Design a protein with these regions (language model features):
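Membrane-interfacial, low-structure loops and terminal tails that flank and connect transmembrane helices
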Residues: 1-17, 91, 198-238, 570-590, ...
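Core alpha-helical transmembrane segments of integral membrane proteins
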Residues: 1-55, 59-62, 74, 80, ...
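Membrane-interfacial loop-to-transmembrane alpha-helix junctions, especially the N-terminal start
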Residues: 14, 96-101, 146-149, 204-209, ...
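Transmembrane helix-loop-helix hairpins at the membrane interface
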Residues: 56-205, 622-763
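Exposed beta-strand-loop-beta-strand "reactive/processing" segments of non-cytosolic proteins
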Residues: 254-257, 284-361, 405-446
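Alpha-helical transmembrane signal-anchor/signal-peptide segments
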Residues: 259-279
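Long, charged/polar, surface-exposed segments that mediate recognition or autoinhibition
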Residues: 272, 282, 286-288, 340-347, ...
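Short, aromatic-rich amphipathic segments at membrane interfaces
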Residues: 448-479
Length: 773
C-alpha cells in the first residue's frame, strides 16, 4: 500500500533483504571451500546454474520466473506456515517459545531435505549446507517478517540462475541482462516511487502491522446441521425400495461379466522359492557369493514398466489377443520375481557389481544380468569372438538356434581395462504384428556374457502415435492430480475451519489420525523389499535409509492429518444428520450393501461392452510385501481412511448444496471429478480405459449419492466396503491370492461395521455443544 511503502520500516526491510544476499553468497562459498578442501566432499557449484536457458526466446524470463516462484512459495511454505503454526500450537499448550524453537529446527531439516536432489557427496551434504541458512532465514522472519526473507531468497536465486545471461557477449545480450537487473530492482523502485508520491517518510501505521490484527467475533452459523429428515422424493423412494432386487442383479452381473481371469497367468511361487531358484541359477554359472552379498526380491510386472508395457500393447493390438497370449512367456515377459544381489559394504568401486535374476512361475530363469564395475579388468575380444560367445548364449539361455537369426546391431564399448560388446538379433519367424519384430539382446563384458534378454521391436510410427496420444492424455492425468490436490487442500481448510467452529468430531479425528499414522508406518516397513530394490550401492546405506525413514514419517504425518480431518468433519456431519434405520422391510445398511453391489455389477457390465486397449494383468498387491498376510490386514484396516474420505465428500457436497436442496449439478460434478481422478491413479498404464471406468463409476456413484446416501451419511461405510470387497475380489482372483483376499475382506467388513456403529452412537461433546448453541 502507499502508506506502508513510504515508511522507513518497509524501506529498511527491503534494503535488508538485498544486503543479506552477499552474506548468503559468501556463506555458500565458504561452505563449499571448507568442505571440499578439508572434508573431501564433492559439491559441484555449476549445478546451481542452467546454461540451457540461453536457448530460449527470452533467456532472462526463466531465472526471473523461477526466482519469484521460489521466493514467494518456499518462504511461505518453509518459513511462514511452520513457524506460525509452531507459535500457535506452543501458545495453545503454554509453551510458545518452545513451539517456535522446535518449528525453527523442523523447518530447517525439511528445507534441506527438500533440496537434497542436487548432486553431491556425501548424500547428506545438501541438507547440511542449507541447515544454517534456513535457521538464519527463520530468525529473520521471526524478527522482521516475510518481506526480507522473500527478497533475500528471490534475489539470491536470481543472482545464481542468471549467471549464464551475464557470461554471453552476443546481440541482444545487454537487453537480457538489463531485464534481469530491472527485475531485481523492482522492489526498490516501488519504495522510491511511493516515497516520491508521499513527499516524505511516514511512520508505518499501527493498523498495517501484523500485531494489529485481532480475531473477530465468531459469527453464528447461517444454517445449522439439519435436525429433520429430508423428504424422500418419488424417484428416491422407488430406487431405495428396489435396492434388494438391484443388489442381487448386481451380484449376478458381477459374477457374469467381471474379469476374474487375467490374460497372463499369475505368479504362484513365493519369495523364498524365487530366491532359492536364483541361487541355484548362479551356482550353475559357477558363482559363489560371499557373506557380504545381500538378497532382495520383488515381483516385476510389465504393466509397471512403460517400455515393456509398450511392447505388450503393441502385440495385443497388432497381432491380436490370441497371438499375445501365446507369446507371453517367450518373447514377452510374464510376471516374474526379480532377485537382486548387491553389496553395501566394502570398497565403493567394487560395490557397483550386481546380479539380477528374473524367475518365472515354473522356477526357470527368464533373464540374468551381471553389472560389473567399469574399471573391472577383463578380456579384449574381437567382434567375431564376442559374436560367437553371444550366439552360444542364445542357445544355452533361450534354446534358440542363432543361425536363422539376423544380426541387427553390434556395438562396442571400450572400458578402461576390457572391451564390452552388445548384440541385437532379429527373428522374423515370430509374428508380433505388422512392422514389428521379435528380438534378442546379448551383452558381453570382457569374455563373460553379462546379460541376455528378449524384447519386441516396435515401429517408430506406432511409438510416435502412442507418444502423441499419451501427451494429449497427460493433460487429463494432470487434471486428476489437480483434483486430488484440491481435495486435500479442501480437507485441510474445511477441517481447520471445522475445528475452529466446533464442527468436528474430535474422537473420530483422533482415532483415524492415530490408526492411519501407525498404518502408514507399518505399510512402509512391510514394503521393505521394494524399497531395498531401489537402494543405490554407491551411496552410504545409512543416509539412504535415514532419508527413506524421514520421508516415510513425514508422509505418514501428512496423510494421517488429512485422514483425521476428513474423519472428524465427515463424522460430525453424519452424526448430526437424521438416521435412516429401515427402508421398507429391510435395514438401511442392507440397502447400502445392495447399492454397492449394484454399482459394481453395473460397472462390470458396461466395462465388458468396451474393447480392451491393453491386456489385463494380475496385480501383486500383497505378494511383493515382506509379510503378505500382514499386508492384507493392513490393507483392510486402511479402509478406515477411504470411508473417512467419502464421509467428508458427502459432508462437503451437502454444505455446498445446502443440504442437497440446491445446485445438485455441483454434487454430480464433484463426484465425477473424484471418480475420474481415482480411476486415473489406479490405471495409469491404460488411461483411456481409466477414463471410461471413471466416468461409469462417477455417474453411478452420483446417482447413489442423490438417491440414497444423502438421506443418511451413516450408510457410507457399508456402501464403500461393498465396493472395495467386490472390486478386491476381482484383483485377488486374477492374482490367485484368495487367502489374502479373505483376510482383507474380513478386516474391511469389520472396520465398516465398527465405523457404522460409531456413527450411530450419540454425537460427541463437540457436536452436541454445537446443536445446543
Amino acid at each position: 500500500s502507499r502508506d506502508a511503502a513510504a515508511s522507513p520500516q518497509v524501506a529498511g526491510r527491503t534494503l535488508g533483504g538485498y544486503l543479506f544476499v552477499p552474506l548468503e553468497l559468501a556463506l555458500v562459498a565458504a561452505f563449499y571451500y571448507a568442505t571440499n578442501r578439508w572434508l573431501g566432499w564433492w559439491q559441484p557449484s555449476e549445478v546451481l546454474t542452467d546454461p540451457n536457458i540461453l536457448g530460449s526466446a527470452v533467456p532472462a524470463l526463466t531465472p526471473i520466473a523461477v526466482s519469484l516462484q521460489a521466493g514467494f512459495m518456499e518462504e511461505s511454505v518453509f518459513r511462514a506456515i511452520p513457524l506460525s503454526l509452531g507459535a500457535l500450537i506452543g501458545a495453545r499448550y503454554g509453551h510458545r517459545t518452545l513451539g517456535i524453537a522446535l518449528a525453527v529446527l523442523v523447518q530447517a531439516l525439511i528445507f534441506g531435505g527438500a533440496h537434497a536432489n542436487y548432486p553431491g557427496f556425501p548424500a547428506y551434504s545438501r541438507p547440511v549446507e542449507l541447515f544454517l541458512p534456513a535457521i538464519v532465514w527463520a530468525l529473520i522472519f521471526l524478527r522482521f517478517g516475510l518481506l526480507p526473507t522473500i527478497l533475500l531468497h528471490a534475489t539470491f536465486d536470481l543472482t545464481l540462475f542468471s549467471i549464464p545471461v551475464f557470461l554471453v557477449d552476443a546481440p541482444g545480450a545487454r537487453v537480457q541482462q538489463g531485464l534481469v537487473i530491472a527485475a531485481a530492482l523492482v522492489p526498490l523502485a516501488a519504495i522510491a516511487v511511493r516515497r516520491w508520491q508521499a513527499g516524505a517518510w511516514r511512520e508505518l501505521p499501527d493498523a498495517l502491522r501484523n500485531g494489529a490484527w485481532r480475531p473477530g467475533a465468531e459469527a453464528p452459523e447461517a444454517q445449522p446441521a439439519p435436525t429433520t429428515a429430508l423428504a424422500i422424493g418419488r424417484a428416491s423412494n422407488a430406487f431405495q425400495h428396489a435396492l434388494p432386487v438391484l443388489g442381487i442383479a448386481g451380484v449376478i452381473a458381477w459374477v457374469a461379466f467381471a474379469p476374474f481371469h487375467a490374460d497372463v497367468p499369475p505368479l504362484r511361487i513365493d519369495r523364498a522359492e524365487a530366491i532359492a531358484a536364483a541361487d541355484a541359477a548362479l551356482a550353475a554359472q559357477g558363482m559363489t557369493l560371499g557373506p557380504g552379498w545381500q538378497r532382495f526380491a520383488t515381483v516385476k510386472l510389465a504393466s509397471d514398466d512403460p517400455q515393456q508395457w509398450a511392447w505388450h500393447k503393441y502385440v495385443w493390438r497388432e497381432a491380436g489377443p490370441d497371438a499375445y497370449r501365446k507369446l507371453v512367456g517367450t518373447i514377452l515377459a510374464p510376471p516374474v520375481w526379480e532377485v537382486r544381489y548387491a553389496m553395501f559394504g566394502g570398497d565403493v568401486v567394487e560395490r557397483a557389481e550386481e546380479w539380477r535374476v528374473a524367475i518365472t512361475n515354473d522356477r526357470a530363469v527368464r533373464a540374468m544380468s551381471h553389472s560389473l564395475p567399469e574399471a573391472r579388468p577383463g578380456a579384449h575380444l574381437t567382434r567375431d569372438d564376442a559374436l560367437a560367445l553371444a550366439r552360444k548364449a542364445l542357445k544355452t539361455r533361450f534354446d534358440v538356434d542363432a543361425s536363422p537369426l539376423k544380426l541387427v546391431a553390434a556395438d562396442q564399448q571400450q572400458r578402461p581395462a576390457r572391451t564390452d560388446w552388445s548384440f541385437i538379433f532379429g527373428d522374423s519367424r515370430i509374428f508380433v504384428g505388422a512392422g514389428g519384430e521379435a528380438r534378442y539382446a546379448v551383452a558381453v563384458s570382457g569374455d563373460e556374457v553379462s546379460g541376455a534378454g528378449r524384447f519386441v521391436y516396435v515401429p517408430e510410427a506406432w511409438t510416435r502415435g502412442e507418444r502423441e496420444l499419451d501427451n494429449r492424455l497427460q493433460v487429463v492425468a494432470l487434471a486428476g492430480v489437480a483434483v486430488f490436490f484440491a481435495a486435500a487442500l479442501a480437507a485441510l481448510v474445511v477441517g481447520i475451519l471445522g475445528w475452529v467452529r466446533h464442527r468436528v468430531d474430535t474422537r473420530a479425528l483422533a482415532i483415524v489420525f492415530a490408526v492411519t499414522f501407525i498404518l502408514a508406518l507399518l505399510s512402509v516397513a512391510n514394503a521393505w523389499p521394494g524399497i531395498a530394490m531401489q537402494l543405490s550401492t554407491t551411496e552410504p546405506l545409512a543416509s539412504q535409509l535415514t532419508m527413506k525413514i524421514l520421508g516415510g514419517i513425514a508422509s505418514a504425518l501428512v496423510g494421517a492429518l488429512l485422514a483425521g480431518l476428513c474423519a472428524g468433519v465427515g463424522a460430525f456431519g453424519a452424526r448430526t444428520s437424521p438416521s435412516l434405520l429401515r427402508i421398507g422391510r429391510w435395514p438401511a445398511v442392507v440397502a447400502a450393501v445392495a447399492a454397492g453391489a449394484f454399482v459394481v455389477g453395473l460397472q462390470a457390465t458396461l466395462s465388458a461392452l468396451a474393447t480392451p486397449e491393453a491386456p489385463t494383468w494380475p496385480g501383486a498387491p500383497w505378494i511383493s510385501q515382506a509379510w503378505p498376510l500382514a499386508g492384507a490386514v493392513l490393507s483392510g484396516v486402511g479402509f478406515i481412511g477411504l470411508a473417512s474420505a467419502e464421509l467428508f465428500v458427502v459432508y462437503v457436497v451437502s454444505r455446498l448444496t445446502r443440504g442437497f436442496t440446491q445446485r445438485l449439478w455441483l454434487a454430480v460434478a464433484i463426484v465425477l471429478a473424484l471418480e475420474f481422478a481415482a480411476a486415473l491413479a489406479q490405471g495409469r498404464a491404460n488411461v483411456p480405459g481409466a477414463l471410461v471406468s471413471g466416468g461409469i463409476a462417477g455417474v453411478v456413484a452420483s446417482g447413489v449419492l442423490l438417491l440414497l446416501l444423502r438421506y443418511d451419511p451413516r450408510l457410507v461405510p457399508a456402501f464403500a466396503a461393498t465396493i472395495v470387497v467386490m472390486g478386491g475380489a476381482i484383483k485377488a482372483a486374477q492374482a490367485a491370492a484368495l487367502l489374502p483376499l479373505a483376510i482383507d475382506a474380513i478386516v474391511t467388513i469389520a472396520i465398516a461395521v465398527w465405523y457404522t456403529r460409531f456413527l450411530r452412537r450419540e454425537p460427541s461433546t463437540a457436536a452436541a455443544s454445537y446443536r445446543e448453541a
